[in-house]
């Protein structure tokens, strides 16, 4: 699973996780 921030203007606590590479 890969987690990353969906927007750099938003805090690192809000991120998006996707199952897969």
UniProtKB/Swiss-Prot annotation:
Location relative to the cell: Secreted
Function description: Binds to muscle nicotinic acetylcholine receptor (nAChR) and inhibit acetylcholine from binding to the receptor, thereby impairing neuromuscular transmission.
Region (Disordered): 1-21
Name listed for the protein in its UniProt record: Short neurotoxin E1
Molecular-function GO term, any one: toxin activity
Post-translational modification: Contains 4 disulfide bonds.
A GO cellular component annotation in the UniProt record: extracellular region
Family: Belongs to the three-finger toxin family. Short-chain subfamily. Type I alpha-neurotoxin sub-subfamily.
Organism, as annotated: Micrurus pyrrhocryptus (Coral snake)
Keywords in alphabetical order: Acetylcholine receptor inhibiting toxin, Disulfide bond, Ion channel impairing toxin, Neurotoxin, Postsynaptic neurotoxin, Secreted, Toxin
Tissue: Expressed by the venom gland.
């Amino acid at each position: 699973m890969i987690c990353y921030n969906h927007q750099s203007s938003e805090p690192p606590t809000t991120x998006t996780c996707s199952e897969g590479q």
